[in-house]
Amino acid sequence: MEDVRAIDFMYYVATPEFIARWNKAKEGELVCRMERALGGSLPSFPSLEAMLAAMDEAGVEKVFITQCKMWSHRNHWMYMDTQLEEVLQYTTRYPDRFVGLAGYNPYRITESLQEIERAVRQHGFRGVYVHIYGFDIPLHDRRMYPLYAKCVELNVPVSMQVGHVLEGMPSEHGRPIYLDRILCDFPTLKVVGAHTGWPWVEELISVCYKWETVWIGIDAWMPKYLKPELVQFMNSRLGQDRCLWGTNGLPWKQSLEQLRALGLKPEVYRKVVRDNAVELFQLQVPTPAGSA
């Protein structure tokens, strides 16, 4: 299994400048217990080449860079406002190694949709990433529906954090069961429920079981802490095709080592860390040696 070149579907801009700006923006924000325990900062690399070297060492072929937009629930401003150009510096310089996901601001719907259109059609982004909590609206709010319609039009997935949120924001808005309502209205929309959905893991599994266009993101948790129900689902006939590995900034090498230690079948491991992402996001990857 160690020879499988992994694809991380969930990461952030990791330049020193971006991380410094993010750390400065968080001053005066509510910092919760878990965020303090993790050090309160995303990882950074001194250069794109340093990041590529770390990816190579861990056996990671591609990393998705999200244009994350996070509204402060406490102070009411966009305290993470990733710019399209910040993602493009990755995807234009190393298009074989980095994949872009556009962002969405439900307070600026028209502008967001225009930028998503440009990101996908002109720059080859493979989808959209949403962090809803600080905006204080649920995933099935009417202000989210223009995004879902646009993703259906462009035939790209929308990845969204579901479950609890680490930052000082209400977690209730990210209940995975809300995806059920969304899919009732957009049955062809391809959705990734990122961050495992904890503590509502079984809600996310149930929605994935019901709808053929829902995937579960195995990210933001070190695999040894995954709920047994999720590991069992990954190893199941249905779940092996509907789970995607990612890190959300956690260390690649240790994450993959822990994932291999869960006892997944080799074919399941390959699907979770690579093949499912290739299929869902329609990625161009090298054909394995010996393939027809």
Task: Identify the residue ranges that each predicted region occupies.
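Catalytic pocket-lining loop regions of alpha/beta-barrel enzymes
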Residues: 122-127, 136-244, 287-291
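Active-site gating/metal-coordination segments in enzymes
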Residues: 61-62, 67-160, 164-166, 170-173
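Short aromatic-enriched loop/helix-cap "lid" or pocket-rim segments at secondary-structure transitions
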Residues: 17-22, 75-78, 113-114, 170-172, ...
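Conserved, mostly hydrophobic/aromatic
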Residues: 10, 55, 87, 100, ...
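Mid-to-C-terminal alpha-helical segments outside catalytic/metal-binding sites
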Residues: 1-62, 118, 238-244, 252-292
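Alpha-helical scaffolding within the catalytic cores
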Residues: 46-54, 82-88, 114, 176-179, ...
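Flexible loop residues that form catalytic
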Residues: 12-14, 68, 133, 196-197, ...
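N-terminal cationic-hydrophobic initiation segments that often serve targeting/anchoring roles
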Residues: 55, 91-95, 120, 183, ...
